[in-house]
Amino acid sequence: MESSLKQEILYRLKKIETAVQRLITQNEMVKTVNDYYCTPWGMERLESSCMLLIAVGESIKGLDKDTNKQLLPLYPEVDWKGAMGLRDIIAHHYFDIDGETVLDVIKSDLPTLSQLGRLCS
Protein backbone atom coordinates (compact mmCIF):
# COMPACT_ATOMS: atom_id res chain seq x y z
CA MET A 1 0.00 0.00 0.00
CA GLU A 2 1.33 3.41 -0.96
CA SER A 3 2.72 5.40 2.00
CA SER A 4 0.43 8.43 1.64
CA LEU A 5 -2.63 6.20 1.24
CA LYS A 6 -1.57 4.21 4.29
CA GLN A 7 -1.21 7.43 6.30
CA GLU A 8 -4.65 8.60 5.17
CA ILE A 9 -6.20 5.27 6.12
CA LEU A 10 -4.54 5.31 9.55
CA TYR A 11 -5.76 8.87 10.07
CA ARG A 12 -9.33 7.87 9.20
CA LEU A 13 -9.13 4.80 11.45
CA LYS A 14 -8.04 7.05 14.30
CA LYS A 15 -11.00 9.37 13.64
CA ILE A 16 -13.35 6.37 13.75
CA GLU A 17 -11.72 5.17 16.96
CA THR A 18 -12.13 8.63 18.53
CA ALA A 19 -15.81 8.78 17.55
CA VAL A 20 -16.41 5.31 18.96
CA GLN A 21 -14.71 6.24 22.23
CA ARG A 22 -16.94 9.33 22.45
CA LEU A 23 -20.02 7.19 21.88
CA ILE A 24 -19.02 4.81 24.64
CA THR A 25 -18.14 7.60 27.08
CA GLN A 26 -21.23 9.70 26.34
CA ASN A 27 -23.48 6.71 26.93
CA GLU A 28 -21.90 5.36 30.12
CA MET A 29 -24.80 6.65 32.23
CA VAL A 30 -27.42 5.17 29.89
CA LYS A 31 -28.43 1.84 31.41
CA THR A 32 -31.75 1.16 29.68
CA VAL A 33 -33.55 2.47 26.63
CA ASN A 34 -35.83 4.41 28.99
CA ASP A 35 -32.85 6.59 29.85
CA TYR A 36 -33.04 7.81 26.26
CA TYR A 37 -36.80 8.20 26.01
CA CYS A 38 -37.80 9.55 29.42
CA THR A 39 -35.63 12.65 29.74
CA PRO A 40 -34.73 15.57 27.49
CA TRP A 41 -31.00 14.87 27.95
CA GLY A 42 -31.65 11.25 27.01
CA MET A 43 -33.25 12.15 23.70
CA GLU A 44 -30.38 14.52 22.96
CA ARG A 45 -27.95 11.73 23.80
CA LEU A 46 -29.77 9.31 21.48
CA GLU A 47 -29.87 11.83 18.65
CA SER A 48 -26.21 12.79 18.98
CA SER A 49 -25.25 9.11 19.20
CA CYS A 50 -27.11 8.45 15.97
CA MET A 51 -25.21 11.23 14.21
CA LEU A 52 -21.87 9.77 15.32
CA LEU A 53 -22.99 6.29 14.26
CA ILE A 54 -23.80 7.70 10.82
CA ALA A 55 -20.33 9.27 10.64
CA VAL A 56 -18.64 6.03 11.71
CA GLY A 57 -20.62 3.95 9.22
CA GLU A 58 -19.95 6.38 6.40
CA SER A 59 -16.23 6.42 7.20
CA ILE A 60 -16.13 2.63 7.19
CA LYS A 61 -17.84 2.58 3.80
CA GLY A 62 -15.23 5.00 2.50
CA LEU A 63 -12.37 2.90 3.86
CA ASP A 64 -13.81 -0.20 2.25
CA LYS A 65 -14.07 1.56 -1.10
CA ASP A 66 -10.65 3.22 -0.92
CA THR A 67 -8.91 -0.05 -0.04
CA ASN A 68 -10.71 -2.00 -2.78
CA LYS A 69 -12.41 -4.10 -0.11
CA GLN A 70 -9.01 -5.39 1.08
CA LEU A 71 -8.78 -3.89 4.60
CA LEU A 72 -11.98 -4.87 6.37
CA PRO A 73 -11.69 -8.65 5.81
CA LEU A 74 -8.37 -8.56 7.68
CA TYR A 75 -10.32 -7.83 10.89
CA PRO A 76 -13.23 -10.29 10.98
CA GLU A 77 -13.80 -9.68 14.70
CA VAL A 78 -15.44 -6.36 13.77
CA ASP A 79 -18.99 -6.41 12.40
CA TRP A 80 -18.26 -4.11 9.48
CA LYS A 81 -21.41 -5.00 7.61
CA GLY A 82 -23.49 -4.26 10.70
CA ALA A 83 -21.83 -0.86 11.18
CA MET A 84 -22.46 0.12 7.58
CA GLY A 85 -26.00 -1.23 7.70
CA LEU A 86 -26.83 0.65 10.89
CA ARG A 87 -25.62 3.84 9.23
CA ASP A 88 -28.06 3.22 6.37
CA ILE A 89 -30.96 2.53 8.72
CA ILE A 90 -30.34 5.65 10.79
CA ALA A 91 -29.78 7.88 7.77
CA HIS A 92 -32.75 6.66 5.73
CA HIS A 93 -35.27 5.65 8.39
CA TYR A 94 -34.50 8.24 11.07
CA PHE A 95 -37.99 8.35 12.56
CA ASP A 96 -38.04 4.58 12.93
CA ILE A 97 -34.84 4.32 14.98
CA ASP A 98 -35.00 1.74 17.74
CA GLY A 99 -33.26 3.09 20.84
CA GLU A 100 -32.82 -0.44 22.16
CA THR A 101 -30.79 -1.37 19.08
CA VAL A 102 -28.68 1.78 19.33
CA LEU A 103 -27.98 1.12 23.01
CA ASP A 104 -27.12 -2.53 22.34
CA VAL A 105 -24.69 -1.56 19.57
CA ILE A 106 -23.00 1.02 21.79
CA LYS A 107 -22.71 -1.28 24.80
CA SER A 108 -21.99 -4.59 23.01
CA ASP A 109 -20.45 -3.96 19.60
CA LEU A 110 -18.51 -0.71 19.85
CA PRO A 111 -15.90 -1.86 22.38
CA THR A 112 -14.37 -4.10 19.68
CA LEU A 113 -14.39 -1.24 17.19
CA SER A 114 -12.81 1.09 19.77
CA GLN A 115 -9.57 -0.90 19.48
CA LEU A 116 -9.42 -0.38 15.73
CA GLY A 117 -6.48 2.01 15.67
CA ARG A 118 -4.35 -0.38 17.69
CA LEU A 119 -5.40 -3.35 15.56
CA CYS A 120 -4.45 -1.68 12.30
CA SER A 121 -1.27 0.18 13.16
Task: List each model region and its residues.
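Solvent-exposed interaction patches of small proteins and small membrane subunits
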Residues: 1-121
